[in-house]
Swiss-Prot record:
It comes from Archaeoglobus fulgidus (strain ATCC 49558 / DSM 4304 / JCM 9628 / NBRC 100126 / VC-16). Disulfide bonds: none annotated. This is Trk system potassium uptake protein TrkA homolog. The RCK N-terminal domain binds NAD and possibly other effectors. This is expected to cause a conformation change that regulates potassium transport. NAD(+) 2 binds at residues 226-253.
Length: 436
């Protein structure tokens, strides 16, 4: 497929890197240093303004199967998206940072002609709400048009899974543990693998079966949630959670902002105060929270809030992190989940591309996850156990038409099956060769 990307920032660069091996990728970037960086990839790079019609025509946007507008400027993204659609691009996906342009994380079939508008701020809020809603969840990735979810969960101390072999967990029939991240290393588990507190497990499940996982790896429900920062992310997360949580508290330092939201967020207790004041946190009983979300405008403040909350007894701490390079640092010092808006955008765009039959990679704790389509007739009718897969590779799910199957060794492959394969990064080329 022909894919034109406007913007070679973090999102655009990583999309180009993942798509280039299997597609014709053209990327437009105005900044010289970013242009030079992306030029090193196997792509056609054009130095120019994506809102300029001549630049768009030089990129051949009229022949594009997909046009992705992910520059750091909302107006450039919106204008280039309109122009791309007008001259013939089949699918146009536009990122907008300002939530005034959209009222939900993803808007499809926009009246102005965009196929998809994505708001990173609202998408991050939605992701935070999903993680809080599944106790122990660290990351959730959707595949195959929403039929399959890959969830990374942390095994909590004293949970049903702590100290048990996988075979003894009696997981629901359509659920499989595909990988375990333990002590900095990835393991592909077997039935006799014993889980331990602190393990991070990647689980593949039918979307409708996710609810059945609650209570196995952590507590069954999240009852008390505290959110720090009443900006777009904090207030939208509170709005989502208030529909199903027993107690949602939103803490904000600005009295003006608190007053503005007081009549808007039904079921949310809004408190004005300094989130870095330890006495205030004790008074508000933050230590009794099942989950806290630090969503202020400062990375440093979010880190401090998270660590203070955990120290007081909060079970899970999630923090918004603007600087992508801080994500690993936050998690290394005790933050359970660090969410970066640009990473969330990348994941959302990748998810949309998968629904357009563009196969892309995902990653959970260093394990590569690739979705492959079976079109090699030599493989049709073969049982999974007879495939020459690398020793540590595992097929986590099969999507067949509108049906999702959690496979066993004797499951046979059919033409056009979509397989979700977990493997180590250095084995991806071999896997692609098998299904080519």
């Amino acid at each position: 497929m022909r894919i034109v990307i406007a913007g070679a920032g973090e999102v655009g660069y990583h999309l180009a890197m993942s798509l280039a091996p299997n597609h014709d990728v053209i990327i437009i970037e105005k900044d010289v240093s970013r242009f030079e960086r992306v030029s090193e990839l196997d792509v056609v790079a054009i130095n120019g303004n994506a809102a300029n019609m001549k630049v768009l025509r030089d990129a051949g946007v009229e022949r594009a199967d997909v046009f992705l507008a992910v520059t750091g400027n909302d107006e450039v993204n919106l204008l280039s998206g309109l122009a791309a659609k007008k001259v013939g691009a089949k699918n146009v996906i536009v990122r907008v940072e300002n939530p005034e342009y959209v009222d939900r994380p993803i808007v499809k079939e926009h009246p102005l002609g965009y196929d998809v508008l994505i708001c990173p701020q609202l998408s991050l809020a939605q992701e935070a709400a999903r993680l809080i809603g599944i106790p122990g969840a660290i990351e959730v990735v959707t595949f195959s048009g929403g039929k399959v979810e890959m969830i990374e969960l942390q095994v909590m101390e004293g949970s049903k899974a702590d100290g048990k072999a996988i075979a003894d967990l009696y997981l629901p029939q359509n659920v499989v543990i595909a990988s375990i991240y333990r002590n900095g290393h990835i393991e592909i588990p077997r039935g006799d693998t014993v889980l331990r507190a602190g393990d991070r497990v990647a689980i593949v499940s039918k979307t409708e079966d996710v609810e059945m996982l609650k209570g196995i790896f952590g507590p069954p429900v999240t009852r008390r949630v505290t959110i720090f920062g009443a900006g777009t992310i904090g207030s939208y997360t509170a709005k989502i959670l208030a529909k199903g949580m027993t107690s949602v508290k939103l803490i904000e330092s600005s009295m003006e902002r608190c007053e503005a939201l007081s009549g808007e967020l039904e079921g949310v207790r809004i408190v004005c105060g300094d989130a870095t004041d330890i006495e205030f946190l004790i008074e508000e009983e933050i230590g009794k929270s099942d989950a806290v979300l630090a969503a202020t405008e400062s990375d440093e403040k979010n880190l401090l809030i998270s660590l203070l909350s955990k120290n007081l007894g909060a079970r899970i701490a999630i923090a918004k992190v603007e600087k992508r390079e801080y994500v690993k640092l936050f998690e290394a010092v005790g933050v359970d989940v660090a969410l970066n808006p640009r990473s969330v955008t990348y994941n959302e765009v990748s998810k949309l591309l998968r629904t357009m039959r563009i196969e892309t990679l995902a990653e959970i704790e260093g394990t590569a996850v690739v979705e492959v389509v079976v079109r090699n007739t030599r493989l049709v009718g073969k049982a999974l156990k007879d495939l020459p897969l690398p020793k540590d590779a595992i097929i986590g799910a099969i999507v067949r038409g509108n049906e999702c199957l959690i496979p066993r060794g004797d499951t046979t492959i059919e033409y056009e099956d979509r397989l979700l394969v977990f493997a180590k990064w250095d084995e991806i080329e071999k896997i692609e060769e098998i299904f080519r």
